[in-house]
Amino acid sequence: MSGNTGERPFADIITSIRYWVIHSITIPSLFIAGWLFVSTGLAYDVFGSPRPNEYFTESRQEIPLITGRFNSLEQVDEFTRSL
């Protein structure tokens, strides 16, 4: 015989008005907040990733590829200086 944990059944939760009032506000709010986070460019600043127009500069049109195993730090410094 299984015991009763005292939790509310899931069917009761998703059929309640209170559940839908709360989630009809929070789910679209999270979607809008995420869209604004990305569309304003704040995501690029927070995570430090380059913006689409910063991948290639006028002076450097080739891919910044690290080729040396032992001088990789110098190559990274060279790439960042050219930015």
Swiss-Prot record:
Compartments reported by the entry: Plastid, Chloroplast thylakoid membrane
Domain of life: Eukaryota
SUPFAM superfamilies linked: Cytochrome b559 subunits (SSF161045)
Keyword set includes DNA-binding: no
Coiled-coil segments: none
Cofactors named for this entry: heme b
Bilayer topology term: Single-pass membrane protein
Family, as annotated: Belongs to the PsbE/PsbF family.
Chain's role: This b-type cytochrome is tightly associated with the reaction center of photosystem II (PSII). PSII is a light-driven water:plastoquinone oxidoreductase that uses light energy to abstract electrons from H(2)O, generating O(2) and a proton gradient subsequently used for ATP formation. It consists of a core antenna complex that captures photons, and an electron transfer chain that converts photonic excitation into a charge separation.
Complex formation: Heterodimer of an alpha subunit and a beta subunit. PSII is composed of 1 copy each of membrane proteins PsbA, PsbB, PsbC, PsbD, PsbE, PsbF, PsbH, PsbI, PsbJ, PsbK, PsbL, PsbM, PsbT, PsbX, PsbY, PsbZ, Psb30/Ycf12, at least 3 peripheral proteins of the oxygen-evolving complex and a large number of cofactors. It forms dimeric complexes.
Name of the protein described by the UniProt record: Cytochrome b559 subunit alpha
Organism for this UniProt entry: Huperzia lucidula (Shining clubmoss)
